[in-house]
C-alpha cells in the first residue's frame, strides 16, 4: 500500500524484495489489512496525473531516447529532486497507515532498550530474530537495540540518525551479501556515510556478514554480535579458520516466548510430509487463537531427498526466523534415518519422539543406534512408533504415509483435542480430495482414524541409559578410488549428507575456492531410499537392455562377462549365455542402495510370454545383491561387444559405461535417461554448458556430483553460468576450444610438412586428416602425442604441443537447459517447430 501510493505521488518505481527462502517459504499466521480502511488514503489526483502522463497516441510523446554525451549527464541530474522528496512521501503514507491501523511504521524503526549502548542496524527477516534476542537480553539487564531499515533507497541519513538512541556507544551493521574486494558491504557503507559528521561521528561502527545462501542466523549468533568487542569485521553462522572473521556463538538459546511449542519432522522428498505439515499449520492457525509458523528445509535432491519441516505454535507472536534445534516434538517419517542423522538429540528433556517404522521391541533393539537409545532414556523422552507404510498399503494409499502420520502427530502433540483434530483433518481431506471421488476421500478418512488409533507407546528399557555411542552410519569408502574424490567425500560430503554441513569450517573449502568439485562423488552416497527395487529374472530376459536404457539413475546395467569373469563372480550372481556371442555371459545388475524404486525398468521390460524379466521386490530383503552390481562395475567395458551390437542401438549403447550416475533427480525422471545416453556416446570428450534449472540441480548440486569418469580418468567437463545466457556461454566454450585448436593445428601442419621423424610426420598427417571428426580424432591425437614423446627431437612445436596435449583432440560441445531457458515453457517445442 505504502509503495503503491508513494510510487504514484513520487513518480518513481519501487521494488518490494524478499531476502530468500526464509521469507518466501515460510507460512505465518498474519493480520491482514482491509482495503476499505486504506482506500481513502490514496491520492486520486496523483492517479489522474499518472494516467494523464502515460503513453497514449491521443497525446503522444517518446521515451527512452538515445542521448549523446553532450546532454546525458544533465538529463540524469534533473531527476534529483524526485529522489530527494521521496523519503518524506513514504513516511507520510506510513503515518497514514499507522493512524488507521495502530501500527508504527517508519523509514527506520528502533526496537530495544531506551538507553541502548550497542545497536544493530539490519534489514529483512533477521530483524525478527534480533528483536526476540533483544527481549531475552534486556530481561537480563543488557542495554541493546536494533534499527530496522524499511526504506533502503533513497537512503535517508536524517531518518537513520533520528532512530538511533543518543546513548549508543557501538553500532554493528549486518549485511546479507558479499561484495569481494569492496571495503565494506552496501548497508555498512551507507551507515558509515550517513553518520559521518553527525552526533554519532565518534561511535565505532562494526560490520558483519550473515545469512549467505540462506545460512541460518540464530539468537546465539546475535548475542555474539552484541558481546563482540574484538572484531570490527566479522561473519556469523560459520567457522572461519582461514581469515578468522567469524564470531563464536554459544550453545543454542531458547529465546521463544514461554508456551511456544516447537515441532520438527524429518521426511523423504515426495512422501507427503511437507504437504501434511502445511495442512497441519493451517488447521491450527485457522481453528485456534494460537499463532502458527511453518518453514520447510530441504536439500537439493529432487523427490527422494531429506526434508525437514519446522512448525511452531504459541499464544504470542512468533518472531523466530531460524531453524528449530530445541524441539518439544520430533517425528521421523523414514526409518532409514535413525542411524544417519542426529534427530532425537534436538529434543528438550521430556519431549516426544515419533518414529515411523515396522519394528517391534526386538526390532528397535536391533536397529536403533546406542546414542539414540541413551538420549531417549537419559532425557525422559516419550517414545512412540507407528507403521505408517503398512497402514498406507492396507488402506490403498501405497507409500503416501502423510495423512497417517499427521493424525498421529495431532494425537500426541495435544495442541487441539483429538476428536476436534480428527474432524478438522477429515474436513481438510474432503476439501482436498473431494473432486477425486468418494473412494479417495474415504481412504483418507480411514488413514486419519488409523493414524490416531495405531500409535504404539514404547516402554523405554532401563538398560538404554548405558547404551554405547555407535556414531552415525556412513557408506563404506573405497580407498582405492581417486584421491581427489575420496578426500572430498571424507572431508565434505559425509558431513553434509549427515546434515552436519554447518559445522564445516572455511578451511575445508580452500581447495574448492574456485567453485570446482571433483567428478563422481555421488557413487559414494548409497542413500538406500527405495522401498522396492528391480530383481532380475534371467529365464525371462531377452537381453534387449531397454531397462538400462530408461533407468534415470544408471543403477541397472548389463554386464558382458568372459567365462573366467563369470566363474569369479560373487556367490549367487546369475548369468546366462549372451545371444550372438556364445563365448560370453550376460547379466543384469542393480545397485540396490542407489535405486529410487521408480519401476521404469520393470515397466519397459518386454519379458517372455507375458512374464517380466524384472519384478519389483523389497529392497531390504535384496540389498545383498549390491555385491553383484559392485562386481559388474569392476568388469571392463568390452569394445568387441559394443562393436557387435553397435553403440548407435539401444542394446549396444548400454554396454558402454554411463558417465552420469546416481544423480539426485526424481524417481522416474524423464531428463536424465537422455543425458546419461549422451555421456555413453560422447562422455569421454564432452563439454557441457548447463543452464540453471532442474538439470543443473541433479547435474551438480554439491556435494553430490553424478557426472563421473572412465577408468582412464576422462569424462564430461561441466559448468553452469546463469539461467538466461546458456547459449552464449556454451558458444563461448566452443569458440575458446576452436581458438586453441586452430593455433595448435598450425604447429601440427609444420610437423606434417617437414618433420625429420617419419613416425611424427605420419601421425601429424593422420591428426590433420581427422581434425574435424570427434569419433576418430581422439585416437589420432593419442598417436601424435606418443610419436612426439618418443621421437627425441627438440623442435619448438613438440614442446608446445605436448604442453597443450589435452586441447588437441576434437571435443563434443553440448548445451543443456530446460524449457524456461529455451523460452519454451508450456509449448513442448511446438512453437519452435512451427517457427
Region spans (language model):
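Conformationally flexible catalytic loops at phosphate/diphosphate-handling active centers
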Residues: 14-109, 470
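Structural signature of the thiamine diphosphate
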Residues: 1-49, 204, 214-250, 443-465
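Glycine-/acidic-rich phosphate or pyrophosphate-binding loops and their flanking alpha/beta elements
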Residues: 95-118, 131, 246-260, 523-524, ...
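Thiamine diphosphate
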Residues: 1-9, 91-239, 249-349, 352-402, 671-687, 696-706, ...
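Active-site cofactor/cluster-binding pocket
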Residues: 154-159, 167-170, 174-185, 259-269, ...
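Ferredoxin-type iron-sulfur electron-transfer modules and their immediate structural context
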Residues: 421, 434-595, 602-687, 691-814, ...
Amino acid at each position: 500500500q505504502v509503495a503503491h501510493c508513494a510510487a504514484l505521488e513520487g513518480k518513481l518505481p519501487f521494488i518490494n524484495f524478499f531476502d530468500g527462502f526464509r521469507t518466501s517459504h515460510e507460512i505465518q499466521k498474519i493480520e491482514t489489512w482491509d482495503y476499505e480502511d486504506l482506500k481513502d488514503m490514496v491520492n486520486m489526483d496523483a492517479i489522474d496525473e499518472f494516467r494523464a502522463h502515460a503513453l497514449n497516441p491521443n497525446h503522444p510523446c517518446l521515451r527512452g531516447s538515445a542521448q549523446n554525451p553532450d546532454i546525458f549527464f544533465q538529463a540524469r541530474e534533473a531527476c534529483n529532486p524526485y529522489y530527494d522528496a521521496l523519503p518524506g512521501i513514504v513516511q507520510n503514507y506510513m503515518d497514514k497507515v499507522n493512524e488507521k491501523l495502530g501500527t508504527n511504521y517508519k523509514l527506520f524503526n528502533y526496537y530495544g532498550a531506551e538507553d541502548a549502548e550497542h545497536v544493530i542496524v539490519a534489514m529483512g527477516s533477521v530483524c525478527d530474530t534480533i528483536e526476540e534476542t533483544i527481549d531475552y537480553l534486556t530481561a537480563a539487564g543488557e542495554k541493546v537495540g536494533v534499527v530496522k531499515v524499511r526504506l533502503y533507497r533513497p537512503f535517508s541519513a536524517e531518518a537513520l540518525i533520528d532512530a538511533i538512541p543518543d546513548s549508543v556507544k557501538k553500532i554493528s551493521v549486518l549485511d546479507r551479501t558479499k561484495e569481494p574486494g569492496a571495503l565494506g558491504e552496501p548497508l555498512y557503507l551507507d551507515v558509515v556515510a550517513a553518520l559521518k559528521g553527525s552526533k554519532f561521528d565518534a561511535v565505532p561502527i562494526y560490520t558483519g556478514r550473515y545469512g549467505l545462501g540462506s545460512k541460518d542466523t540464530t539468537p546465539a549468533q546475535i548475542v555474539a554480535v552484541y558481546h563482540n568487542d574484538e572484531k570490527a569485521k566479522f561473519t556469523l553462522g560459520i567457522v572461519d579458520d582461514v581469515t578468522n572473521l567469524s564470531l563464536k556463538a554459544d550453545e543454542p538459546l531458547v529465546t521463544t516466548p514461554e508456551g511456544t511449542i516447537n515441532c520438527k519432522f524429518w521426511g523423504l522428498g515426495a512422501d507427503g510430509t511437507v504437504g501434511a505439515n502445511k495442512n497441519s499449520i493451517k488447521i491450527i492457525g485457522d481453528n485456534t487463537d494460537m499463532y502458527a509458523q511453518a518453514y520447510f528445509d530441504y536439500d537439493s535432491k529432487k523427490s527422494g531427498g531429506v526434508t525437514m519441516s519446522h512448525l511452531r505454535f504459541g499464544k504470542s507472536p512468533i518472531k523466530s526466523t531460524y531453524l528449530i534445534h530445541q524441539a518439544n516434538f520430533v517425528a521421523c517419517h523414514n526409518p532409514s534415518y535413525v542411524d544417519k542423522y542426529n534427530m532425537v538429540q534436538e529434543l528438550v528433556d521430556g519431549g516426544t519422539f515419533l518414529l515411523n517404522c515396522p519394528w517391534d521391541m526386538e526390532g528397535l533393539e536391533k536397529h536403533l543406534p546406542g546414542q539414540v537409545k541413551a538420549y531417549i532414556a537419559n532425557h525422559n523422552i516419550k517414545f512412540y512408533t507407528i507403521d505408517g507404510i503398512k497402514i498406507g498399503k492396507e488402506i490403498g494409499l501405497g507409500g503416501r504415509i502423510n495423512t497417517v502420520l499427521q493424525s498421529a502427530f495431532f494425537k500426541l502433540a495435544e495442541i487441539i483435542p483429538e476428536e476436534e483434530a480428527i474432524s478438522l483433518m477429515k474436513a481438510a481431506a474432503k476439501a482436498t480430495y473431494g473432486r477425486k471421488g468418494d473412494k479417495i476421500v474415504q481412504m483418507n478418512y480411514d488413514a486419519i482414524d488409523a493414524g490416531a488409533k495405531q500409535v504404539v507407546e514404547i516402554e523405554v528399557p532401563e538398560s538404554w541409559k548405558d547404551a554405547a555411542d555407535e556414531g552415525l552410519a556412513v557408506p563404506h569408502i573405497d580407498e582405492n578410488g581417486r584421491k581427489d574424490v575420496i578426500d572430498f567425500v571424507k572431508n565434505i560430503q559425509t558431513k553434509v549428507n549427515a546434515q552436519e554441513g554447518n559445522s564445516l569450517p572455511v578451511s575445508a573449502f580452500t581447495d574448492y575456492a574456485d567453485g570446482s568439485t571433483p567428478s563422481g562423488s555421488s557413487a559414494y552416497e548409497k542413500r538406500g531410499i527405495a522401498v522396492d527395487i528391480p530383481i532380475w529374472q534371467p529365464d525371462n530376459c531377452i537381453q534387449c537392455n531397454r531397462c538400462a536404457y530408461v533407468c534415470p539413475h544408471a543403477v541397472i546395467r548389463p554386464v558382458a562377462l568372459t567365462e573366467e569373469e563369470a566363474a569369479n563372480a560373487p556367490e549367487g550372481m546369475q548369468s546366462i549365455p549372451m545371444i550372438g556371442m556364445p563365448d560370453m555371459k550376460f547379466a543384469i545388475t542393480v545397485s540396490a542402495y542407489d535405486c529410487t524404486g521408480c519401476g521404469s525398468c520393470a515397466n519397459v521390460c518386454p519379458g517372455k510370454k507375458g512374464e517380466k524379466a524384472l519384478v519389483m521386490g523389497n529392497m531390504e530383503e535384496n540389498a545383498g545383491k549390491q555385491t553383484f552390481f559392485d562386481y559388474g562395475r569392476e568388469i571392463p567395458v568390452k569394445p568387441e561387444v559394443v562393436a557387435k551390437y553397435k553403440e548407435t542401438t539401444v542394446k549396444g549403447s548400454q554396454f558402454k559405461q554411463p558417465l552420469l550416475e546416481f544423480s539426485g533427480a526424481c524417481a522416474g525422471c524423464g531428463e536424465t535417461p537422455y543425458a546419461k545416453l549422451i555421456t555413453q556416446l560422447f562422455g569421454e570428450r564432452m563439454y557441457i554448458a548447463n543452464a540453471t534449472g532442474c538439470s543443473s540441480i541433479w547435474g551438480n548440486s554439491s556435494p553430490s556430483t553424478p557426472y563421473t569418469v572412465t577408468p582412464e580418468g576422462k569424462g564430461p567437463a561441466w559448468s553452469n553460468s546463469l539461467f538466461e545466457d546458456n547459449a552464449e556461454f556454451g558458444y563461448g566454450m566452443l569458440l575458446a576450444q576452436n581458438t586453441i585448436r586452430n593455433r595448435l593445428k598450425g604447429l601440427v601442419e609444420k610437423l606434417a610438412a617437414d618433420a625429420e621423424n617419419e613416425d611424427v610426420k605420419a601421425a601429424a598427417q593422420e591428426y590433420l586428416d581427422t581434425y574435424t571428426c570427434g569419433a576418430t580424432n581422439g585416437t589420432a591425437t593419442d598417436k601424435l602425442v606418443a610419436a612426439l614423446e618418443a621421437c627425441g627431437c627438440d623442435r619448438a612445436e613438440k614442446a608446445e604441443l605436448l604442453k597443450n596435449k589435452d586441447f588437441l583432440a576434437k571435443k563434443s560441445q553440448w548445451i543443456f537447459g530446460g524449457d524456461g531457458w529455451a523460452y519454451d515453457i508450456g509449448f513442448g517445442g511446438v512453437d519452435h517447430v512451427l517457427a
